[in-house]
Amino acid sequence: MQVTETLNEGLKREIKVVVPAGDLEAKLAERLETARGRARINGFRPGKVPTAHLRKMYGKSFMAEIVNEILNDSSRSILAERNEKSATQPEVIMSEDEKEAEKVLDGKADFVFSLNYEVLPAIEVKDFSKIAVTREVVDISDEEVDEQVKRIASSTRTFETKKGKAENEDRVTIDYLGKLDGEPFEGGADNDAQLVLGSGQFIPGFEEQLIGLKAGDEKVITVTFPAEYGAAHLAGKEATFDIKVKEVAKPNELVLDDETAKKLGIESLERLRQVVREQIESQYGQITRQKVKRQILDALDGDYQFETPQKLVDAEFNNIWQQINFDLQQAGRTFEDEETTEEAAREEYRKLAERRVRLGLVLSEIGEKAGVEVTEEELQRAVYDQVRRYPGQEKEIYDFLRRTPDAVANLRAPIFEQKVVDHLLANINVTDKKVSKEELTAEDEDAASEAKPAKKAAAKKKAAPKKKAEEGKSEEA
């Protein structure tokens, strides 16, 4: 096999490979001889089938197998010999001339093909011990825990029908019909809807107009949907709602005791407080870690500048772009609604894709140099967590993961990255800073540098007056 480098520009490589017809013939002769000893063909004794007869019957199919084996093995062997790592699976380019292909299969022509690929850039790990980050820490007060316990326990609160007017914290049962310009709109109606006044369950201005109503009262209220409302056809629009009050109920006293905790599946009130404190600590801890990680990534981004494999960047950009367009479509919005243009958005997300790829390569190199590994136990736990997300489909998901190495690799990657971040945290300068929970959870304008850019399509909301909590999705690097 003759290997010749025909392109070496930056990270791009092109390798021409020529397998002489004589080499192919030698491999075919060896395969025919092996087959001759096993062949069972009518008219011939076992092991005595003439090679020429076997060649006539199986020559082309055997040669096709040989060619495929060469293609499968060549990338790995050539990269190993050149001491290179390909960023993606090398692209194989062969002649599309059918006559030429027939000559190769007939053993009358050399097998010629090219490998096109990009190499992973050589990265020299720099001294990261000088990186300094600030870790924000929140002291969790007993009052905050008790407040959260009350919110959780309020789901067990009972209500008692009353005859008077509805007040704040009362529960009203209503029928409502929403209209735009006098016409009902989809998703804007419900019967026997229960609403605790003051809970903020419905859009602003809705609940306040129900205060003072009694069972049997009917009223038409006017509200304006928030400008950022997820359903684009309702955002910023004024709507009316025909309201019929069917019941007003006052809340009974909320008792916080062991019995209340048991209704929530917790053995005691003390244990409930402990669980709530742990949940708050975990929530704040995740935010803190994200902020610290962002500082680390920003520091690394400033320290490492090198050419990135364009195919990796293209793949990352395509993933981002697909998600962005899906978000916009779901929300019924356009780039203009997001105060940008498609061209500007493409440029912005392209930069984000390049940053992610570059930082991913840096973290990978740091982890490799530090001997960071994902254990089988950690990977199995990730597989279990993934399978558990699909109740009723556990077997199908498990089988899919078992036969799809790339899917398992996608589970391994974030574990590896988190362990590399842990390694960095143990070797850089970390200063703890006490902050309030408001400071910790404040919107970070720079978050786009490691997550999605600030201009982002909002999640679609149901076209009803109920507010839906949006869950933020942070994507690393």
UniProtKB/Swiss-Prot annotation:
It comes from the Bacteria. Keywords: Cell cycle, Cell division, Chaperone, Cytoplasm, Isomerase, Rotamase. GO terms for biological process: 'de novo' cotranslational protein folding; cell division; chaperone-mediated protein folding; protein transport; protein unfolding. Residues 435-477 are annotated as: Disordered. It catalyses: [protein]-peptidylproline (omega=180) = [protein]-peptidylproline (omega=0). Belongs to the FKBP-type PPIase family. Tig subfamily. Its EC number is 5.2.1.8. Transmembrane segments: none annotated. InterPro entries: PPIase_dom_sf, PPIase_FKBP_dom, Trig_fac, Trigger_fac_C, Trigger_fac_C_sf, Trigger_fac_ribosome-bd_bac, Trigger_fac_ribosome-bd_sf, Trigger_fact/SurA_dom_sf. PROSITE patterns: FKBP_PPIASE. This is Trigger factor. It is an enzyme of class 5 (isomerase). Involved in protein export. Acts as a chaperone by maintaining the newly synthesized protein in an open conformation. Functions as a peptidyl-prolyl cis-trans isomerase. PANTHER family: TRIGGER FACTOR CHAPERONE AND PEPTIDYL-PROLYL CIS/TRANS ISOMERASE, TRIGGER FACTOR-LIKE PROTEIN TIG, CHLOROPLASTIC. Residues 454-466 have a biased composition (Basic residues). GO terms for molecular function: peptidyl-prolyl cis-trans isomerase activity; protein folding chaperone; ribosome binding. It comes from Brucella ovis (strain ATCC 25840 / 63/290 / NCTC 10512). Consists of 3 domains; the N-terminus binds the ribosome, the middle domain has PPIase activity, while the C-terminus has intrinsic chaperone activity on its own. One of its GO terms (cellular component) is cytoplasm. Residues 169-254 form the PPIase FKBP-type domain. It is found in: Cytoplasm. Residues 467-477 have a biased composition (Basic and acidic residues).
